[in-house]
Structures are given as structure tokens and as C-alpha cells.
Swiss-Prot record:
Cofactor names: Mn(2+)
Binding site for substrate: 45, 179, 185, 305
Places the protein is found: Cytoplasm
Reaction it catalyzes: oxaloacetate + ATP = phosphoenolpyruvate + ADP + CO2
Pfam families tied to this protein: PEPCK_ATP
Protein name: Phosphoenolpyruvate carboxykinase (ATP)
Any single GO CC term annotated in Swiss-Prot or TrEMBL for this entry: cytosol
Keyword Signal included in the entry's annotation: no
Gene: pckA
Highest rank taxon of the organism: Bacteria
UniProt remark on cofactor binding: Binds 1 Mn(2+) ion per subunit.
Entry keywords, A to Z: ATP-binding, Cytoplasm, Decarboxylase, Gluconeogenesis, Lyase, Manganese, Metal-binding, Nucleotide-binding
Amino acid sequence: MADGLNRVHYNPSTAQLVEFALLRGEGELTANGALVAKTGTRTGRSPGDRFIVKEDSSAADIEWGPVNQAFEPGAFEGLWARVEAFLADKELFVSDLEVGADPEHYQPVRVTTQYAWHQLFARNLFIIPEEFNRQDKPVWQIINAPDFVCVPERDGTNSDAAVILNFAERKVLLAGLKYAGEMKKSMFSVQNFLLPAQGVLPMHCSANVGKDGDTTLFFGLSGTGKTTLSADPKRFLIGDDEHGWAPGGVFNIEGGCYAKCIDLSQKNEPVIWDAIRFGTVLENVVMDEHRVPNYKDSSLTENTRAAYPLEHIAQRKEDNRGAEPHAVVFLTCDVSGVLPPVSILSKEQAAYHFLSGYTAKVGSTEIGSTSAIQSTFSTCFGAPFFPRPAGVYAELLMKRIESFGSQVYLVNTGWTGGPHGIGKRFDIPTTRAIVDAIVSGELKNVETVHLETLNLAVPVAVPGVDTNLLNPVNTWSDKALYAEYAQKLAEAFTKNFAKYQVSDAIRNAGPKA
């Protein structure tokens, strides 16, 4: 993009970007030094406004539909040109960054933003390389123009805003949106398309590693505990949201964290609490009159966020990489109160539950979501971000689990003793005790009890956890009502899974309706 008429700031520092954001009225400084920015009416992702350009090089490999909406190449060219013209006289911020902390599987990306705080977000969440693009790969381009207003009749969009990915031209266009999470999820979608062709499984998961080099992965939708549980004071963080699993190891796709802030406390989440300081972007967080963030305030949105670089975490894996995982945890938030707090899965059950992605939308990251909690099935624990058919990712997961011998667990961070509104949610200390037992290997080869309707193996004891909690029927006062809810959940699983073409071994690994 030309910089003759406008001022362009290349690879600006954190301090410069904070100064620019404050001078330009884009945000305010909090008492803890973070920058607060508001995103207007769109306080989450806009899935109805996300498109992929339908062109010959990638069209046959994409699962088109409501998640991956098609956009015409000609319409994209016109809209890209109009956005470039709109930005031609604007002050801009540009950085050369990378996505993928692996010397073979990274993607170089040039990020151009209209807002200073969006550039700070990109530099926090993507990777700032010591040497840009060492392998001289073709460079992706992101343009983020939040003040551009799309016109559906002219631009071919669904509303006044759009997120459009173009694999042939290696371009990502964000127009009319202030919510910064769209930038990170766009490049995640890019890697989710590119990595399988390289034999790498892209994953919507967090990852950490112990002192002995043992890696654990945590899959789950927003709000199920990925970030909280991976930020473990006893372990070293690899990353909190996006990873690749290649033969030989896992790597972070990002260079930062995007942690949910609602009800954040120093006691329960000390690692995240301490990471929020100068350089952090707080999105839609409300402050009091003394500029102290009020993390309990959801008046703007439940989806309040902190975006900070991994350098803000003391206990982290500095190269953002780890060995192949000994333990893989699927986090589910069960609103029916039926699932046990932990189950031990066979590889066929792992494939079944990976494809199912059963959980709940808790403080959903999508616009239009309310604080109401509803159950959902999200393929691969991240359906909105995976362009290829689900089977591609499930096959890669099975291959990686089989070749390395990883043990997979299903951990319920949702309700017990009754559904949401009647039962109570598992507290963080209980889930942490379960995770501690998983990562220490204490749940390998233990005695289990089989839950027939759910078709799950549940350990009879977990160190530090009340034994009565382990079999969910024990926590319900009305046992007949539990059986009824369990049957309903099994039927929901079976109905959802009918769309998948899989082996009988995988299909039979699910609940028994």
C-alpha cells in the first residue's frame, strides 16, 4: 500500500502504539497499565459476515455452507480496491509478523490496520520474528479497515461489515468491524486450511508442558476452560488457543493469549491476572472512576477479553513448542448436568467426541449471543474455524493419537446434580485436581466404572476429588430424572452424529440412545 499521501508506521513498538491509541482517542489507560478499547455494537465474532472466496485452487477442498460462505472473486477484487482507496489518505500501522511457531509450518503475514490498538492486538497475538520470513515464503496480507462501511448491494456482503479470506491471493480483508478477535481467527482459519496438506493437525486447543517435558492439550470452545486450565502455575504454557500437531511435536500458531476476563480473579486465575499490564489490550472491559478494571461488569458484553503477548507470562515455553502430547483433554461444558467430571476415552471414542464437539456456548464469542447458556455441537471443538470437511481433521487426530499413543480424556467443566439452573457448576479447584491427576499420569490404567447410556468409562477415584462427584447419578437427588436427562443427551448425540460417514467402530463408540 502506497505511503505517499498518508503516514504509515512500520513495525511500531508497543509504547508507540499505546501512545497513538491514546492520542487518537481509540482507548483509555487502566490503573494496571493496560489499554482499554471498545468495539461498539459488535462485541464478538460475526459468523454471518464471514466469507471465503470461491476460486479454482481451493474450492474443491472447502466444506461450503453457513460456516464457510462463498464469495465471488470479482466481488472480492472490487471490495479490496475500494478499501485500499478508502485507506489511501489515512494514517496506517503496518507490521511484518508470522503465524505458526515452527520453522517449516509458519506463514508470513503483513498486517495493515487503520487503528493503532488493532495493530497492538496483532503484535500481541501473532509472532514477532527475529528474522522475518526466513524461508522467503509468499506473504499473506491482512487489511483491517473498521471505519469502512460495506454496502451489500454494491459489495456483495450480507451487512455493513465483512471478513473475507482469499486463499489464491493470500489475502484477508476485514471491513466495518472493530472486534479484534476477527483478525486472529481469520489467520487461524488460514492455517486450518493449509496445515492438513502438510500432514499437520491444526487444533482449537491450549497446550502446556511439565518440568519433564510432558505435553498436555486442552480442546474446547470459548468459556470451557482452555485458557484457565492451561495457565497452570506448576507447568509451562505453550499457548492458550491455537496449535498444530506435527509428527514429532506440537507448536503454537500464535505468539500471545486472548483470555476471557468476565469474573476474572487473582485467586482463581493468577497467571492471567498477572499478565494484564502495560501492553495488554483489554476489550470491552468496564473501569471504575479510578480506572480500575471491573471484571464482574458485563454491561458491554459477557465476552470481555485481554490480549497480551506470551512474554507477559513468566512460566512459558520460550520457543512456543512442545513434544507430542501424552495427554489430550476434551473440555465440555455440559448444561444438562449428566456427564461425569472426567471420562477415559478409547481412540474410537476420541474420534467420536472430537467430531461431535458437544459443549455449551458460555459467554459466547459470537455477536447476538446473550448470557443465556445453551448446549451445542461444534465439530472439532471449533466448527466456525475449520474450512475443510470435518473428517479430514478427525483422521489426522486418529493418526497422531495412534502413532504416539496419547491418552484422551473427556472433562466436564459444566454442571452436575441437575441441569443449569438447578444443579451447580463444577468449581475450578475440582477441575484443576482432575487435570493434575491427568497430567501426572495418575489416571492411566486405573479402575473404572462403565456408564451404560453415555457409554463412558469413569475412574472410581481421583486424588483430591470427592468420590461422590465422579459418577454423576450420585449428585442427583432424583435418580429417575437423571436417567431421563441422560437418555435425552444420548439421543441428541446420536441425532447429531448421523451426518458423519465413519466406521462402525467410531459410530458405536458414542452414547447409546
